[in-house]
Amino acid sequence: MTAELEAQARTEKTRSFTHSLREKGMIPAVVYGKNVGSLSIAVDAGELQKILEGAGSNALIRMKIKENGKIRKHNVLVKEVQRDPVRRELIHADFHQVSLKDRVHATVPVHLTGSAAGTVEGGVLTPLLRRVEMECLASEIPEAITVDVSGLRIGDTITVADLPLPPGVRALEDPEAPVVTVTAGERPAAEPAAAPGAAPAAGPEEAEE
């Protein structure tokens, strides 16, 4: 599903202008690509936040850019966002204009589901790769790759080559790179046996009467 976002072209880049944008709920942003060059814009922070929360950071966005009384429409991806370090509010965004006919690179999160059989045997489930670099059409970027770990026993590993990728999606990572594994848990060290004839360990001292 393609999200929609309106943008306003801007020429001013002063701090006071940026402050006035944020007072209106807008943030400065930049969109770049072969059909737009590098264009400074402003977008509604709340609308962008809704897209990020609902469709994820890899969402394909149909952007309507208002400039000099005209509207230009472009397909874009969110390249980077900046947030206030304290309040975590959006303060800036970069967008990359893409063609629906071209393949793009995207970093997709890996989600684990199920309870590994090996953990019942005392093993430890260890995620090793939480995000995977992939290549596909801009309209086919998966929101996440879900991996079922239910069948993993101690010593088992799921690699990049084992990931259930949708048709048309190709992983760019090393196929042998481990994604998740189950290792044997550490056993508590056994107490050394007392030597034959050794005196028992002294107990707490008793006060003399």
From Swiss-Prot:
GO terms for cellular component: cytosolic large ribosomal subunit. Part of the 50S ribosomal subunit; part of the 5S rRNA/L5/L18/L25 subcomplex. Contacts the 5S rRNA. Binds to the 5S rRNA independently of L5 and L18. PANTHER family: RIBOSOMAL PROTEIN L25/GLN-TRNA SYNTHETASE, ANTI-CODON-BINDING DOMAIN-CONTAINING PROTEIN, RIBOSOMAL PROTEIN L25_GLN-TRNA SYNTHETASE, ANTI-CODON-BINDING DOMAIN-CONTAINING PROTEIN. The gene is rplY. GO terms for molecular function: 5S rRNA binding; structural constituent of ribosome. This is one of the proteins that binds to the 5S RNA in the ribosome where it forms part of the central protuberance. Residues 184-209 have a biased composition (Low complexity). Pfam families: Ribosomal_L25p, Ribosomal_TL5_C. This is Large ribosomal subunit protein bL25. The keyword RNA-binding applies.
